[in-house]
Amino acid sequence: MPKSVDSLFLARTMNRFNPIVLVGLLLSPVLFLALAGRTDGNRPHVLFIAIDDLRPELGCYGSPIAKSPNLDKLAGEGMRFDRAYCQQSICSPSRASLMTGARPDQIGVIENTAYFRELNPDVVTLPQHFIKHGYEAVYCGKIYHARMTDDHHSWSRKPAYDRCPKMKWLPGNYALKENQELWASNKEKMLAKYGKAGSGGLIHGPAYEAADVEDHVYGDGFSTRLAIATLEDHLERKPSQPLFLALGFKKPHLDFVAPKKYWDLYDRDEIELASQTKSPKGGAATGLHASFELRTRHGIPKSGPIGPDLAKTLLHGYYACVSYVDAQIGMMLEALDKAGIREDTVIVVWGDHGWHLGEMGIWGKATNYEIATRVPLIVWTPGMKARGQSTHALVELIDLYPTLCELADLPRPNHLAGKSFVPLLDEPKSKWKKHALSQFPNPALREWAANPLSPGMRQTFFGPLIKEVEGKIIRQQGKSWDRDLFENHLMGYSLRTEGHRLVAWMDYRDLDAQPVFLELYDQKADPDETTNVASGNPGKTDALLRQLKRELARAPPRPAK
């Protein structure tokens, strides 16, 4: 806010109060933080909120069930992006792509186990770029994938742990003793049976929990407390320095764990199961997984369908987690208002990818379809003209890096693959991108972290399920079946246009070769992507394939080592 506004505010205060009262006001913490929030150079603060595994399942996106009043209000005061897409529908690649401003192929991060900094030691990340231009940058919660937090480069300080009560460690991240014991027992069994290497990803307890505890007992509530304390600490210590504050929520990622009061917001009888539970007719057998991530949880069938009662409980848990996170965001926004810096802050809320909640017969992320690649994106800026509106423009998460640079009046790094969507904040109906590009390596024959099947995975309880999925692919491919290609080198590239989605399954070592399989979905006639119409529309399929290859040529995969 301009200094003249502060001067006017003080002048009015002088006229209304005597000097003794005025001194008391100036010494009050709220007013101190309000005045402290003015930054040098009028550069805005940035509140950068990431939500794990959240698809656009919010009231503001038309969900008839989800209770998300705080995000709904933010969208009503900012801008809602109705067609925003991630670059890969799994945690580490999606987040690394957004934070570096490059596509997964460009940085070589196509699985959770790949660390972008090891592969790209000189890349300048989004918060790193802000630090270079005078910002303080700090994160609370999950921004990058676990153990790949890039602390040395991306962040200039640690959160204010000294101002926040410590969080009690929860075994397995469960609050209920019986669930902690189930987790510990499962851990012991998996380690004994498969060893440390073979049990990776298999050690879990129940898929859900509804403990009657305070919000901060679980991680997301603690992260919110910590972020608020860090905000206050920064405004006291460095009042004139702009702050890039990243707050990352781990829910509604499995396990669906949230305080009981958020479960109580929902009437179980009103929760509807997915209506489209079949795989796409004529679709790629390699395009869907067998819900591996969910099936590692205690009490979930290791094969076969998820029954309706269990499915409803899982949906209930997902919605409870959505409301839990929404409440935390409400507290964070209230802290901005209390500090008096809301009008000096750019707010961005994004989900890293979508999630199948029974759609197409599976549970989880990790596909190239609409339900997994489309994400929620809400932006609020102090000076936006199209307040309270939405846009149908196609945008991608890699567009956030250049957008925030423009909003903060920072130079744009040369390596960015995205496009600033600042013009949409003024005119949401502007002509925009013709497509959004996502990718995912063979979901059917990869582990749930997108990494190739480990040597021992076929020997676990997933062995029969892997064999079943593999059999479907072999039957579809016939003589073209190549185990090494399908397990290690097959990439699905998904091009989303105004009216269609093309999914081209290709050997990413040779993008000039003929695709192994092609899928085409008519988004206007078939928004649920129930039927692959590629064979009946060769002209449209070929045109979109050429368009896809042109885009891939601009950002080719890193050479395989």
Give names to the regions the model predicted.
Residues 520-521:
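Short hydrophobic beta-strand that contains or immediately precedes a catalytic carboxylate
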Residues 35-501, 509-513, 531-550:
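Formylglycine-dependent sulfatase
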Residues 2-3, 12-19:
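Positively charged n-region of N-terminal signal peptides that target proteins for export
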Residues 21-32:
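Bacterial N-terminal signal peptides
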Residues 526:
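Intrinsically disordered, low-complexity polar regions and short flexible loop motifs
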